[in-house]
């Protein structure tokens, strides 16, 4: 008998990742493909199918019982559609329907859609930095900026699955126009492409042969480049303003930040915490702890699996097999050797 596994997809503006995950949260297989973010809807779906094909090639696929799909948002978990701001070709795109139509997805499997940042929040609360925390904001800062909320010890996803979408809180009413249609969104200051663009505008020049990415800007900032440092300071200030506003609204105990840009460490967290001290000044928002995500770049995958498990028992499951093991102290996660920031 094949060991039961959950499948997971994590679709973002830079990459499409997939994994097979056992009931303890351990990744037993993985596949990945670059996101053709400016491609057609068909190009994008072909990339998703490429990842599914890669997972289906593993023997563990035969034990698939549930399939979770985390996507950049907005998403609509009621209709199974996605409209990622940083993937223009997908607007109200029927992602769940298309994933279910893949020939290797078993007939009884119904993909469960969740926003990528909500998935990250589910993962960090189940087995990461927010484990045991009653009220937390978990953020993904990468090609875009997203968030998920833990309120009263439970994941709060909202009616359509978009609660916590902090990347599109306005932090500057006269700020740059966002692809979402609003001005001054957090994402236009703190996402990887925005950081790289502002660093260039501030005088940073990447080394010859090096692409102008947030990762390259972080390296330059650590070396003291003023333009790169200014870009990360600007990002930290925008994130701090949004975090302080969220804390004032729902009273947070903890903020967890993951995603590619968060891999820059104190280059981002230093200015963020400094600006947060200026913005979060009320008694119940002051001294709010900001911590890096514990599950690194696998949080979206683990969260997608957790969402799939929470949706109900898999086909043919025994009573003890209806959910991931919440009592497991911490999943054994095989992290990829490489990390990448939103570009």
Can you name each region flagged by the protein language model?
Residues 133-189:
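Glycine-rich phosphate-binding loop of actin/hexokinase-like ATP-binding domains
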Residues 6-10, 63-68, 136-140, 146-148, ...:
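Short glycine-aspartate micro-motif
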Residues 21, 112-125, 263, 267, ...:
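Glycine-rich phosphate-binding/hydrolytic loop that grips phosphoryl groups
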Residues 48-67, 102-103, 129, 202-209, ...:
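Phosphate/pyrophosphate-binding loops at sites that engage ATP/ADP/AMP, CoA/4′-phosphopantetheine
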């Amino acid at each position: 008998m094949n060991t039961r596994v959950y499948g997971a997809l994590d679709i973002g503006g830079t990459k499409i990742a997939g994994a097979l995950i056992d009931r303890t949260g351990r990744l037993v297989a993985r596949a990945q493909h670059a996101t053709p973010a400016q491609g057609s809807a068909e190009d994008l779906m072909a990339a998703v199918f490429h990842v599914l094909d890669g997972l289906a090639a593993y023997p563990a696929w035969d034990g698939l019982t549930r399939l979770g799909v985390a996507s950049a948002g907005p998403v609509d978990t009621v209709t199974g559609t996605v409209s990622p701001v940083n993937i223009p070709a997908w607007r109200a795109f029927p992602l769940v329907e298309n994933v279910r139509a893949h020939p290797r997805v078993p007939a009884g499997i119904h993909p469960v859609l969740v926003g990528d940042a909500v998935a990250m929040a589910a993962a960090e609360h189940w087995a990461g930095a927010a484990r045991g925390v009653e009220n937390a904001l978990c953020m993904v800062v990468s090609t875009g900026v997203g968030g998920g909320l833990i309120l009263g010890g439970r994941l709060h996803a909202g009616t359509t699955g978009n609660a916590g979408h902090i990347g599109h809180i306005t932090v500057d009413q006269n700020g740059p126009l966002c692809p979402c249609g609003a001005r001054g969104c957090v994402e236009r200051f703190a996402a990887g492409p925005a950081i790289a663009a502002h660093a260039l505008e501030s005088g940073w020049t990447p080394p010859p042969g090096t692409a102008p990415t947030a990762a390259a800007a972080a390296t330059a900032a650590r070396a003291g480049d003023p333009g790169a440092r200014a870009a990360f300071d600007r990002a930290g200030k925008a994130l701090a303003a949004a975090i302080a506003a969220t804390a004032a609204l729902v009273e947070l105990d903890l903020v967890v930040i993951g995603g590619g840009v968060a891999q820059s460490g104190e280059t981002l967290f230093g200015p963020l915490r400094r600006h947060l001290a200026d913005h979060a000044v009320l008694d119940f928002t002051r001294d709010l702890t900001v911590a890096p995500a514990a599950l690194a770049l696998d949080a979206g995958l683990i969260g997608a699996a957790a969402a799939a498990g929470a949706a109900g028992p898999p086909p043919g499951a025994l009573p003890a097999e209806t959910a991931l093991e919440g009592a497991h102290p911490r999943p054994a996660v095989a992290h990829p050797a490489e990390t990448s920031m939103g570009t």
